Structures are given as structure tokens and as C-alpha cells.
Design a protein with these regions (language model features):
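A short glycine-rich, Lys/Arg-flanked "PGG" loop and its adjoining helix->strand segment in the class I
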Residues: 129-141
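C-terminal alpha-helical "lid/dimerization" subdomain adjacent to the S-adenosyl-L-methionine
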Residues: 148-203, 210
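A short SAM/SAH-binding and catalytic strip from SAM-dependent methyltransferases
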Residues: 113-127
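Class I SAM-dependent methyltransferase SAM/SAH-binding core
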Residues: 56-103
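Conserved beta-strand/loop positions that form the S-adenosyl-L-methionine
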Residues: 52
């Protein structure tokens, strides 16, 4: 998509400097979870896989270890630097791309799998829909999209309870500060799970599963239908 003067500036939330990125790296023990997710998704040698919002590159490197050709994409230079270190340490090849959901470069119908974890909430809802349409266009027909993000599963009458539970969960389990939770709620763009589901199906995906777990976390497995299939 060509840049326009009205186009959303993803780099207003490049997110993390090197100091904060190191905190994410230190607390992220996701190797086993990443491997399990990729196994569930059926990753095969020779697949083209994109990890958009790749963070420290754990999942991208695990996919490369399974024989996939991997594009590790992130808007944050600090995170891409961590991903490159991960790849060197594990002796795998990944391609890094400094871009986000609205700006990553792709050839239509080229990926066997796209993964995006905890990146979509950086975009307002209109731009979430644009991003999901781009992901749909980048996937081969019959291929999968695996999405995880911070979403609201309660109605608006329960925000205080849910946000406080989420804050406690992240502080106790991931070592984040309360300030980081406050920043997310005040300045970022998480939305309701049912809104995400509608956006995904409107973008053309078949929703295979939606799992709402832990405070304010949602996991979605999608498929891009083949021509002639019901969406």
C-alpha cells in the first residue's frame, strides 16, 4: 500500500528502547510454548512463515529450527536486534524486516503461515481492520493465521475488576511494572474479543477457534479459505 498523508504512523509506538527490550528478553521464557504452538500449527520444512511483531525472535527462531523460511518483522529496532542475537545463538537463518502490520512488505498469496502476538493492540480499530486485510492478502489460500493479543472479554461494566486482575497477573508472572500496565490501558488500543472476531471474519478469514484465557488474553486460529470455499 502506498503511503498517504492520512496513513496511520505506526512508528509513533516503536515501543521499546534497548533497556526495556532487555526486560522483555529476560522475562520471556517462551521457547517451549512457541515450539508447541508451531507444532500445533503443523509447520513443515520449506514453509514460508512471517512473525509480525516478532519481539525478541523466539518464535521466529523456533520456526527456522523446524526448517521454515522465516521473516521476522518488528517496528522496533531494539527488538529486531534481540531477534538477530537469538538467531546467531541458535545458528539459524531468519530475515528481519523493520516494519509493522501496516507496512510490512509482502507478495500476495505467498505465506504458508503468519503469526502475530501482542502487536495488533498498538493500532486503533480502523487500522486493525486494514492490518488484518493485509495479512489475509499475504497468505496463500488454505493457509493459517495465528493471532494472540490483549483483548477485553467482559462488558464495560467490569473494567476495574478485569484491569486490576490483569495488572496483578503481569506483575506477578512476567515482572512488568504497574506503570507499563497503566500505559497500556491509557495509551494503547485493546478492544473487545467480539470486535476482533468480527474484524477477522469481515477480512475474509474462517475463524477456527477463539480462546479467551488469563486476564484479558485472546488466542485466535484462522484459515484463509481456498477459492470456492465458504468463508
Amino acid at each position: 500500500m502506498l503511503a498517504r498523508d492520512w496513513y496511520y504512523n505506526e512508528r509513533r509506538q516503536t515501543g521499546l528502547g534497548s533497556a526495556v527490550a532487555s526486560v522483555y528478553d529476560r522475562h520471556d521464557d517462551s521457547d517451549i510454548r512457541a515450539r508447541a504452538a508451531l507444532t500445533m500449527l503443523g509447520v513443515q520444512r520449506g514453509w514460508r512463515v512471517a512473525d509480525i511483531g516478532c519481539g525478541n525472535g523466539v518464535l521466529a527462531c523456533e520456526a527456522a529450527l523446524m526448517g521454515a523460511e522465516v521473516d521476522a518483522i518488528d517496528i522496533s529496532p531494539a527488538m529486531l536486534a534481540l531477534a538477530e542475537i537469538q538467531a546467531r545463538d541458535r545458528k539459524v537463518a531468519i530475515r528481519t524486516q523493520a516494519a509493522g502490520l501496516l507496512s510490512f512488505a509482502y507478495e500476495p498469496n505467498s505465506y504458508d503461515l503468519i503469526v502475530s502476538e501482542f502487536a495488533l493492540h498498538h493500532l486503533p480499530d480502523f487500522w486493525k481492520a486494514v492490518a488484518l486485510s493485509r495479512i489475509h492478502g499475504a497468505l496463500k489460500p488454505g493457509s493459517s493465521f495465528y493471532l494472540r493479543d490483549i483483548v477485553f472479554v467482559s462488558m464495560p461494566d467490569g473494567p476495574e475488576r478485569d484491569v486490576e486482575q490483569w495488572a496483578d497477573f503481569n506483575i506477578k508472572n512476567h515482572g512488568f511494572s504497574r506503570d507499563s500496565v497503566v500505559t497500556h490501558m491509557r495509551d494503547e488500543y485493546s478492544t473487545f474479543g467480539w470486535v476482533i472476531e468480527r474484524m477477522l471474519t469481515d477480512a475474509g478469514f474462517t475463524l477456527l477457534s477463539a480462546d479467551y484465557h488469563a486476564p484479558l488474553h485472546g488466542t485466535y486460529l484462522l484459515r484463509k479459505p481456498k477459492p470456492g470455499e465458504q468463508g
